[in-house]
Amino acid sequence: MRKPIVPFDDIWKNVVNAAQALEPIPDALGDVYLVRNLYGTVRISVSDAVEGDESCLAALQRLARRLHEVLGAHGVLQENGILFVTDAFLKSIQGGKREVRPNVYLVDRLVTASDWWTVGEPPFPGKAARYTLYSVKGGVGRSTTAAVLAWHLARNGKRVLVMDLDLESPGLSSAVLEPDRRPDYGITDWFVEALVGQGEQVIGRMTAAPRWAQDFDGDVRIAPAHGRESGEYLAKLGRVYMDTDVDPWPVRLHRLLMSLENECTPDVVLLESRSGLHDIAAATVTDVAAHVLLFATDSESNWTDYRILFRHWQQHDLAEQIRERLSIVSALTPEFDTERYLQRFQEGAWDLFRDHLYDDVEAPDSADGFSFDLDDDDAPHDPLVIHWTRGLAAGASLHDLKHSTVSLAYASFLDRFDRLARAGSPREQ
């Protein structure tokens, strides 16, 4: 008879139970890493400095034997379950570690999605307020909203930098910039030129201002995905996300962001993120100290996808670090039965935040936790509302934004955004 399957989703639960039931580990052993590799099998990694220590080896063998017993096909034979590695290797895998008992850590080795594992401050913090426009699904109006926000902020005297980081589906520049005003270079050009030390030589030629912003008290600069001519766009795109020997992709993104902020000196930076759960989106959500506008519609598929992301943050103890950076956006709010739709949307958003990012406390100002009432209109789950209108349905309208059209669709959104901006992002507080 075959043994019952141990599915992938049960790996960490079984590993945690095995590690926590283990007798005390000798201090001489140092840190112990339980590493799930790309195939989903788990091995123990420790410093090769303890390889000859019999007491340490005995403790490791007990743990390896127990892991083999509880992991099924995701385990390995006891004799193959212990890896003695260099201290340099141990240091290289520490970024996504979780402690399950003193000096015992879980680590995932991933091809993608590893950037969702941490929430941190950028290595090169800027002076501008940063906002990321993100969604788990496309087609929810992020590009239009980036243009409207830039229009609104510039009319009120702000200097605004808009970066089109939805590189797999570029379109912001063509929707906002007239063909004769597009810059020579774009974001993909910077990434490939920076590989050979020419990044700073294109920075001054990769932003441009839309004609509709020329009479405003402020300023708008658009950094498009590509320049006036797309050139070998796919060949460049294939090199954008690579890690170099010196810097991983998120650090390269920070360098671009800082270079553009130094060049344009904006008050506000708007980052149009790629949609979905890929690492590329993660960098703009978790790593640039931006306030994140989460675009959603009231559909079960949207809430399901957001639950995947929120549950991940909850399980990896990241809720406290990320939750106050988030604000949900009701995108494409329908023209008819709007009140009932928004009530359902708010309840869905509250369920999402309450179940995964809020603490289970009665009062929002409790010293022991963090929570919000359903009807708290400054809470992350309370939506910034964008109304669907025919006037903004066509991308061409972004070349010539009209106050009446914007007011019809975005009046509520912009009022709430201004209140959010006055309160300040977590990085500024």
Predicted segments with their positions:
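Beta-strand-loop-alpha "switch" segments that mediate conformational coupling across diverse proteins
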Residues: 37, 54, 78-87, 227, ...
